[in-house]
UniProtKB/Swiss-Prot annotation:
PANTHER family: GLYCOSYLTRANSFERASE, UDP-N-ACETYLGLUCOSAMINE--N-ACETYLMURAMYL-(PENTAPEPTIDE) PYROPHOSPHORYL-UNDECAPRENOL N-ACETYLGLUCOSAMINE TRANSFERASE 1. It catalyses: di-trans,octa-cis-undecaprenyl diphospho-N-acetyl-alpha-D-muramoyl-L-alanyl-D-glutamyl-meso-2,6-diaminopimeloyl-D-alanyl-D-alanine + UDP-N-acetyl-alpha-D-glucosamine = di-trans,octa-cis-undecaprenyl diphospho-[N-acetyl-alpha-D-glucosaminyl-(1->4)]-N-acetyl-alpha-D-muramoyl-L-alanyl-D-glutamyl-meso-2,6-diaminopimeloyl-D-alanyl-D-alanine + UDP + H(+). It comes from Bradyrhizobium sp. (strain ORS 278). GO terms for cellular component: plasma membrane. Belongs to the glycosyltransferase 28 family. MurG subfamily. It is found in: Cell inner membrane. Keywords: Cell cycle, Cell division, Cell inner membrane, Cell membrane, Cell shape, Cell wall biogenesis/degradation, Glycosyltransferase, Membrane, Peptidoglycan synthesis, Transferase. Its main location: membrane. GO terms for molecular function: UDP-N-acetyl-D-glucosamine:N-acetylmuramoyl-L-alanyl-D-glutamyl-meso-2,6-diaminopimelyl-D-alanyl-D-alanine-diphosphoundecaprenol 4-beta-N-acetylglucosaminlytransferase activity; undecaprenyldiphospho-muramoylpentapeptide beta-N-acetylglucosaminyltransferase activity. This is UDP-N-acetylglucosamine--N-acetylmuramyl-(pentapeptide) pyrophosphoryl-undecaprenol N-acetylglucosamine transferase.
């Protein structure tokens, strides 16, 4: 690739939910002959993938974690410092466009793009626009959403909004090619339990008790893979060993796309990326939205699949071992229902989002 090719800066918060769509778009842009760089915070340096360290620019940023005057002043100072650093980055790199994928680390580069006169746009994968993207929405030329109707009630923003879907990494596209095969009535039942990039303690608290409450005939059928925090590993392992469950426990699954494709049922949080991947691959799920969020984005995300009869949504206050055991037992006894849920999930997904978003980036940049 020649160095004079247009450069697109991808700005993303340093977690998988923001980085993975950015990576997927980056792959598509490189295919089209563009150069790409990632602007993010220090957390992204630990993720492997498309972006090597020489393709990453780290700018100071801060997430709003508290409403106290001291915390807000610190956040404002760091975001201001980050915006100045990002502005200098714009002057040095001269990008053709900047696209943000959400998270407060995207605020400095997107504001700097506005100050430097660089065309910019944002992508939001949630059913409800995130706080950072909400703040930036008035400062960008275009908005891309994964889901339709996100900004229908905001005429000022709806006019510059395009629904494209969530860009999928190559590993997800490979997994999406694996057809869903429902479990046989007496055959293995493959169950995957995940809790986001940092794990979720509620899964360690609830799932083992639910497995214990299942009919003993189901214990021998289960092939369980569960993401478990290191500090919870011993107590969770003890339950499964006592029940003689075929269980694999890991703090983090590096091959999650393949695991999603290989399982009959997924129990998970409902981050935007997870929901989009479940839909793209077409797998039935039990979704437990993260409680306490200001905009209840995970509740809305889970609703996309539960309303389509592709998932069962359980709020955390109702997520008990008894309730989960009941849902697993019912699904295990109805393989045709699992197959229907998988088909409904696949119908809700889209695999061409990276191409559609790349088209929008090129249009916004005037390329």
């Amino acid at each position: 690739m020649i160095s004079s090719a247009p450069l697109i800066l991808l700005a993303a918060g340093g977690t998988g939910g923001h980085l993975f769509p950015a990576e997927a778009l980056g792959v598509e842009l490189i295919k089209r002959g563009y150069r790409v760089r990632l602007v993010t915070d220090a957390r992204a340096l630990k993720y492997s993938g498309l972006f090597t360290k020489d393709m990453i620019d780290v700018v100071p940023s801060e997430t709003v974690r508290s409403r106290s005057p001291v915390a807000l002043a610190r956040t404002a100072l760091l975001l201001g410092t980050g915006t100045l650093a990002a502005f200098n980055l714009m002057r040095r790199l001269k990008p053709a466009a900047v696209i943000g994928f959400g998270g407060y680390p995207t605020v400095p580069p997107l504001l700097a793009a506005r100050l430097a006169g660089v065309p910019s746009l944002i992508h939001d994968a949630n059913a409800v626009l995130g706080r950072a993207n909400r703040f930036l929405s008035a400062h960008v030329k275009a908005i891309a959403t994964s889901l339709p109707g996100v900004l229908d009630r905001d005429p000022a923003l709806a006019g510059k909004t395009t629904t494209v879907g969530t860009p999928m990494r190559p590993a997800i596209l490979e997994a999406a090619a694996v057809p869903y095969v429902a479990p046989e009535t007496a055959g293995p039942l493959r169950l995957l339990v995940v809790g986001g990039s940092q794990g979720a303690r509620v899964m360690s608290d609830i799932v083992p008790g639910a497995i214990e409450r299942l009919e003993p005939a189901l214990w021998s059928r289960l092939v369980l893979a569960q993401q478990v925090r290191q500090e919870d590993m011993a107590r969770v392992r003890a339950v499964y060993d006592r029940l003689k469950i075929n269980a694999e426990l890991q703090p983090f699954f590096t091959d999650l796309p393949a695991r999603l494709a290989a399982n009959h049922l997924v129990i998970s949080r409902s981050g935007a990326g997870t929901v989009a991947e479940l839909a793209a691959i077409g797998r039935p799920s039990i979704l437990v939205p993260l409680p306490g969020a200001i905009d209840q984005d995970q509740f809305a995300n889970a609703g996309v699949l539960s309303d389509a009869n592709a998932a069962i949504r359980i709020v955390q206050t109702a997520f008990t071992s008894d309730r989960l055991a009941s849902e697993i037992s019912s699904l295990a006894a109805e393989p045709t229902r699992l197959a229907a849920m998988a088909q409904a999930a696949r119908a809700a997904g889209r695999l061409d989002a990276a191409e559609r978003l790349a088209d929008l980036v090129a249009k916004t940049a005037g390329l």
